[in-house]
């Protein structure tokens, strides 16, 4: 089974149900579409723009971005800024008939999205295009599965939902639940409600786990058989938001998002682009993962993005 995760951005009201069957829905909503041995999961940031977190989670979950634009509005600015600050260059704009294409091209000309394709709002064609997209995967590396949802199922026990970011996970694998020291065994694997003995990078999975309860889990925890870094204090070079109207100072409280982990933090030191943060709790990450510093209550919510 080949899997792809597509982020839906912009004017997405009513879009998900045109592209797939509605699945799990919390602050993000998943829509699933399957054709033969290929499956696409579309992610919609349901609670955005009220909350910034779903937008960042979606960016960190996806392989490909679809940005729907009915008209060029101010609200679109934060979404385009986030995609650019994360360096997203794999995606397409889906434009309505009244969108000024020259204006759009001008807006994105200096961004990571400058080479995005421009598509018409034809859902049949979009579905076909997405199901046939090829994404480079690491099937042989260590297993890495960030948890986006988890719950208890009677007679099954603890179940987590997530995307296999890398490697191949198999039934009976023992995986560490980062950032904790706890281990969990994979009892069973489901992909789109079908049982499998293994799942590879790109697949969205439901894993039944032995050895851990839902009380011990949090969104963003990572199942892995590799060596991830765990930290409660972080020094990082940040690319600051060019539209930010304030200076981040020592002693201030913010929030960071790394992968699907969201943690409060205090600024310990700031020296131009270099920042030292003390976190409320430990996070797990891989070298190269992105950290997003946010101020959820401010007008400009995304303060900066840096590479760990």
Swiss-Prot record:
PANTHER family: ELONGATION FACTOR TU-RELATED, SELENOCYSTEINE-SPECIFIC ELONGATION FACTOR. It comes from Methanocaldococcus jannaschii (strain ATCC 43067 / DSM 2661 / JAL-1 / JCM 10045 / NBRC 100440) (Methanococcus jannaschii). InterPro entries: EF-Tu_GTPase (IPR050055), EFTu-like_2 (IPR004161), P-loop_NTPase (IPR027417), Transl_B-barrel_sf (IPR009000). Pfam families: GTP_EFTU_D2. The lineage of its organism: Archaea, Methanobacteriati, Methanobacteriota, Methanomada group, Methanococci. Signal peptide: none annotated. This is Uncharacterized protein MJ0325. One of its GO terms (molecular function) is GTP binding. One of its GO terms (biological process) is selenocysteine incorporation.
